[in-house]
Every structure is written in C-alpha cells, then in structure tokens.
C-alpha cells in the first residue's frame, strides 16, 4: 500500500499493538520498527545480515535495529521480464514465465536454515485463477520438500 496514514512506522506499530499486542508488524523500507524484518525481493539470511534485500535502507536498518525477532523474504513467482506487472498478473505474453522449482526449493531450504519466513507472491490471471504453470511448479516444490525431509 502507498502512504502511511500520517503515522510514522513507530507510531503505526504502536497503534497496531494496542489492538494486537503480539502482532509482528514490519515495513519493507524506511525507519525500522516492529518485530518483523521485511525483505521484499530479498533472500534468506540471519537477522542483521548484509545485502539481503533490494531496498538499500532496509538492509542498513536491519543491522542498526535490535527489535526484530524474525525476518521474512518474499518475491513474485513471476521472474523479471519486460513490460507488465511483477507482483500481480502481468500480460498474456508472460504466461509461460515462472521461476523454476529448483530455485524456489533452494530458497525454501535456506529460509528453514535461518528461521526466516519465506513468502511467494502468486497473482491470479485475468479470470481470477492461479496460472496452471504456477500450480505445476508449486506441486513440484511440494514434492521436493516431501521427498527431502
């Protein structure tokens, strides 16, 4: 979402915690606050690690702020491409694009290693359905996880 409703991150965290004291609020850029380090388009790694997100100030803030209890990293299942959206459904010419199951499984294993939360963004198509290619890759990742416990 764009905008902050007129509150700083610290004020927003305090506002959220008045209703849900144990909530893991976090922000992907700007002043650090909350308990959750958000690494948008980032990667797995320890709290306070270097170069774990594309957001320059987020990495610096993670090192300087000791309130984080856990880190999440996230990226869209749709790999980089020309034109169209990344985080939501893109364009029909990108319907065959998806990160390979091997990459997602590797990132999953690293998230487990560091105790990170790993989130994938999967946007529906124009009909509101998850693309079949995404389902296929996610089923393969699930198989890899089950077979390598």
Name the predicted role of every residue range.
Residues 1-149:
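Mature catalytic domains of secreted/periplasmic carbohydrate-active enzymes
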């Amino acid at each position: 979402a764009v905008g902050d409703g007129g509150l700083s991150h610290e004020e927003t965290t305090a506002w959220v915690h008045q209703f849900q004291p144990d909530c893991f609020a976090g922000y992907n850029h700007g002043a650090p606050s909350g308990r959750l380090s958000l690494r948008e388009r980032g990667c797995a790694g320890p709290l306070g690690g270097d170069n774990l997100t594309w957001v320059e100030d987020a990495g610096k803030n993670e090192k300087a702020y000791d309130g984080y209890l856990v880190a999440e990293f996230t990226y869209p299942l749709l790999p980089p491409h020309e034109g169209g959206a990344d985080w939501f459904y893109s364009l029909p010419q990108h319907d065959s694009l998806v990160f390979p199951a091997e990459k997602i499984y590797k990132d999953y294993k690293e998230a487990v290693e560091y105790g990170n939360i790993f989130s994938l963004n999967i946007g529906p198509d124009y009909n509101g359905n998850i693309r079949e290619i995404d389902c296929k890759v996610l089923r393969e990742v699930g198989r890899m996880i089950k077979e390598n416990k």
